[in-house]
Design a protein with these regions (language model features):
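Intrinsically disordered, low-complexity proline-rich regions
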Residues: 1-19, 158, 193
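Conserved G1/Walker A P-loop phosphate-binding module
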Residues: 9-12, 16-109, 248, 257
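Conserved nucleotide-binding/hydrolysis micro-motifs of P-loop NTPases
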Residues: 41, 86, 99, 106-109, ...
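Switch II of P-loop NTPase G domains
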Residues: 46, 84-91, 105-135, 143-157
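Helical mechanochemical/support elements of P-loop NTPase systems and associated helical scaffolds
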Residues: 50, 76, 89, 116-120, ...
Length: 258
């Protein structure tokens, strides 16, 4: 990247290279502009102005809301419920330019009554298969409990859409780096052997790790530009040469020859 940017500043016959030119990663996040837009309980209540949207799904307590908040660099954008399974709506967050992030209801919490769970499942099924603006699914999985029965069920619902799935293995900070990478490689192999076209990565909301990798994927889905790195040109240091004061040597007096 640095080489490409430097190429935009060719040296001329009377031009010196910029002093100490380097890139400083931007503190801006891809979803930095996200703001709550609307909650919908039916397909008819979804925004009609949407051009592209990405949906976040995950088992209750897998860290979905925390992942959204981390990606948006916002502590309270997505509500982190103390009672898992209580979010029953599709929550839309406006990213600007008619792009949206959609927080889907959490699933797989045993204490949710079947009468409450059934409408969620119908809504999720319709949304994932019928929503043309949906460009891809971000599936949140706790790295310690990946591919639960409920995760598999959701993936089977989504598969007929033919749209991409990117899996965030959250809470990777709960394992050592070696252990987390071993889990990642094992799961990637299992997915590859099964012929499933999923991509996946490690992610930690606590350590804020994995953000750049996730943003690369989601920016491509939404056709959004990534935040540009800041081009930093520090001031040229000033060097002042110290003047050396020389004292004229006094000629030695000749001794009289006597």
């Amino acid at each position: 990247m640095a080489t490409a940017i430097l190429a935009q500043f060719p040296l001329g016959p009377e031009r010196e290279p910029a002093w100490g030119l380097h890139l400083r990663p931007s503190n801006m996040r891809l979803f930095q502009r996200a703001s709550f837009a609307i909650s919908a309980a039916t397909m008819e209540g979804l925004p009609t102005t949407s051009v592209a949207e990405i949906a976040f799904a995950g088992r209750s307590n897998a860290g979905k809301s925390s992942a959204i908040n981390t990606l948006a660099n916002h502590n309270r954008l997505a509500f982190v419920s103390k009672t898992p399974g209580r979010t029953q709506l599709l929550n839309y967050f406006d990213l600007g330019d008619q792009r949206y992030l959609v927080d889907l209801p959490g699933y797989g919490y045993a204490k949710v009554p079947a009468a409450v769970r059934a409408p969620w499942e119908r809504l999720l099924g319709r949304y994932m298969l019928e929503r043309e603006q949906l460009k891809g699914l971000a599936l949140i999985m706790d790295i310690r409990h990946p591919f639960t029965e409920h995760d598999d069920r959701l993936l089977n619902w989504f598969a007929p859409s033919g749209k991409p799935v990117h899996i965030l293995l959250t809470k990777s900070d709960k394992l050592s780096r070696t252990e987390a990478n071993q889990v990642l490689q094992r799961l990637r192999k299992e997915v590859s052997d099964a012929g499933a076209p999923f991509t996946m990565q490690l992610f930690s909301s606590l350590k804020k790790s994995g953000l750049e990798e996730a943003e690369q994927v989601f920016a491509g889905w939404l056709d959004m530009p990534l935040p540009a790195a800041a081009l930093v040109v520090p001031a040229r240091p000033s060097f002042t040469r110290k003047k050396t004061v020389t004292t004229p040597k006094t000629a030695a007096k000749k001794k009289p020859v006597g």
